[in-house]
Amino acid sequence: ITPEEDRFLAAQLELARQFNLPVLVHTPHRDKIGGTKRTLAVIREVGIAENLVIIDHLNELTLPLVLDSDCWRGHSIYPNTKMSEQRMVALLQEYGSEKMVVNSAADWGISDPLKVPKTGQAMLAAGFSEAQVEQVLFHNPVDFFAQSGQLDKQLVSTPLPIDQRRQWQDNSALRGQEPVVK
């Protein structure tokens, strides 16, 4: 972490601490071990509650460092780079699901926003239960972000009714198909 990155990381963590808000920290692309160690040190120097921090873009080398903290453990699943579904499953098998969060992206590089459900499928194929998959892919991130007070866990856990008979401005996307109503 450069001195500038260090200063601005501390400033952003301080804002989160002052307002008691959760914060997501992206580990550096280079020197991931050193950067993760320094990130943890800055978190402690600022004094933000570790349970309000998720450290993201973890891998096999950096996850053990974060396990010694109360921070949440974020993993970005990408095609060809960073973390794959299979590597994520191996980490879950080794370290368990507590505070583990899986995400994906649709960003500037090669990415696949469907990597989260694909990771869920890989977890099921590896013998994880549906409840364990739901814990990692849904409940853990909801529990983390609900700490903000801006996310109602009950509301997001209640399935929305589906009625494809409803239209928007007299228009339907069904194109002649039978509507689903649940």
Protein language model features and the residues they cover:
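Short acidic/histidine-rich active-site segments
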Residues: 30, 97-113, 133
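Glycine-enriched alpha-helix->loop->beta-strand junction motifs that scaffold or abut catalytic
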Residues: 19-22, 43-50, 67-74, 95-99
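Short acidic active-site motifs
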Residues: 61-62, 87
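Divalent metal-binding pocket/active-site signature
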Residues: 1-61
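Active-site beta-loop-alpha junctions enriched in small/polar residues
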Residues: 28-30, 58-61, 76-80, 105-109
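Mid-to-C-terminal alpha-helical segments outside catalytic/metal-binding sites
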Residues: 117-182
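A short, acidic, amphipathic alpha-helical segment used as a generic capping/interface helix at domain edges
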Residues: 84-93
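Divalent metal-coordination and catalytic microenvironments
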Residues: 16, 73, 105, 133, ...
